[in-house]
Amino acid sequence: MAQFDVYARVGRTKSYVVDLQADLLDQLTLRVVAPMVISSTATVISGLTPLVQFQDNEYILLTYQLAAGPARELQDPVGSLSADQDAIKRALDILFLGF
């Protein structure tokens, strides 16, 4: 389990969550995640919801919909957004710090 890993949501087609929690907190039983949806299904909020490319599609990472869930439910990552970590971190700064 690694920060920025992408996991398919159980029972949902083309719906994913991204693990945003720092790797050094692996001992916790919960992980902080945010949903990622096809870009045509949500509105981009400048800076707050980064656009990312994943599996040949454009997605929006909905950082303002953070949630914590059991780490055991995150099985077998289907990819990673580590290449987009700068945009994701900027979005989280906007969410928590306002800039």
Task: Please report, for each region that a protein language model flagged, where it lies by residue.
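Compact nucleic-acid interaction/catalytic patches
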Residues: Q3-V6, V10-P50
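C-terminal terminal-subdomain/extension
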Residues: F54-F99
